[in-house]
């Protein structure tokens, strides 16, 4: 999916949307990305996006610029804003606060595709113990991330990071895609 030249240039600073983000902690991955995202005008970059603020939050979060991501998500009352807000707190890590925001999300349109992607990751890494059920459960994934971050370098951490990348890609695409698509 293409989101325009500005977004492509920014995402190109870190693996074109395929970066594995840390499950917790860390600092902003790219000061240049932070600057370029901050300098771009939301109405220009995501003019016809389904959820422009959500797309902006997703860009900041992709580069682990959590303060900026949190600020934008906090001002976005949509389900997508709550979803990004939940991810910010999951990565903080603050599982209770993340759960609060996921309760505000409810059932999101990306959940079926996210479950499918997570199942593929689980099939490739069965010892990772992702504990998937018949529907995507963001609360269970918070627990997976909590366990995984306490096992640095483990198969579980790698699998959780891969699922988190899939989640980011799906949610960013959902937000940044043109509203009429």
Where in this protein do the model-derived segments appear?
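N-terminal alpha-helical interaction modules that lie
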Residues: 1-75, 104, 108-181
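Short coil/turn linking the two alpha-helices of tandem helical-hairpin repeats
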Residues: 91-93
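TPR repeat positional signature
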Residues: 53, 82-85
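Conserved small-residue packing positions in alpha-helical repeats and bundles
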Residues: 57-58, 86-89
